[in-house]
UniProtKB/Swiss-Prot annotation:
Source organism of the structure: Kitasatospora aureofaciens (Streptomyces aureofaciens)
Similarity comment text for this entry: Belongs to the AB hydrolase superfamily. Bacterial non-heme haloperoxidase / perhydrolase family.
Domain AB hydrolase-1 stretches: 26-264
Record keywords, A-Z: Chloride, Oxidoreductase, Peroxidase
PANTHER family: HYDROLASE, ALPHA/BETA FOLD FAMILY PROTEIN, NON-HEME CHLOROPEROXIDASE-RELATED
InterPro entries given in the database record: AB_hydrolase, AB_hydrolase_1, AB_hydrolase_fold, Epox_hydrolase-like
Protein name (record): Non-heme chloroperoxidase
Positions of the catalytic residues: 99, 229, 258
Amino acid sequence: MPFITVGQENSTSIDLYYEDHGAGQPVVLIHGFPLSGHSWERQSAALLDAGYRVITYDRRGFGQSSQPTTGYDYDTFAADLNTVLETLDLQDAVLVGFSMGTGEVARYVSSYGTARIAKVAFLASLEPFLLKTDDNPDGAAPKEFFDGIVAAVKADRYAFYTGFFNDFYNLDENLGTRISEEAVRNSWNTAASGGFFAAAAAPTTWYTDFRADIPRIDVPALILHGTGDRTLPIENTARVFHKALPSAEYVEVEGAPHGLLWTHAEEVNTALLAFLAK
């Protein structure tokens, strides 16, 4: 299997599993919590059919990548992404992040610039700043909320994932219509296969402050979000994000949950392909 080494922990290397398919302009897809690069399958198929080269990789601690106990912060995640881009020598690339993966996109552009990057897309994003503070009243929740997530993951991450995916896909509305029990089970299995340390460390990165990163986005951008997102509510994320980045193309998918890559794949793919074609 293909791996890219991004670091070292004690006697073992930290390797990221990746897949690289197709030809044409490269599109790098960066997954969300607690999934893997395979969560992009409905977008990967559409992009390949449209003539793009599609690269997915599993973030450290997730999927088939190494499961280290270090490096769970967006500076390191962005450095890992930079290593992927440099190792594959990608040029004129499009970075597409989903949920937690949008943080890599913002921090990469802020830290490494856009010499290799043509466009960026933020799907169900966590920007600009999830933490509710005195100077950020639009934040989604106080730090205690995220501390509670960490505690629940440490207590029984498998039970946590079951509840998490209920709201991730809005199963009370979409199960049996827009998503099957089998697809939900696959998401749970993917989550369970990731590392225990990453599962608890990841939520502490969600309240990273990206407000200083946003002005450095100097390439065409897409912000796309579901109005029914219970995980990262649109009023705390995409709508505030768009005000901070008014040049971005902005799309709201009516009624879509956080996991809209699967439940509303047609709407997502239509908007993404139209953005890429411009």
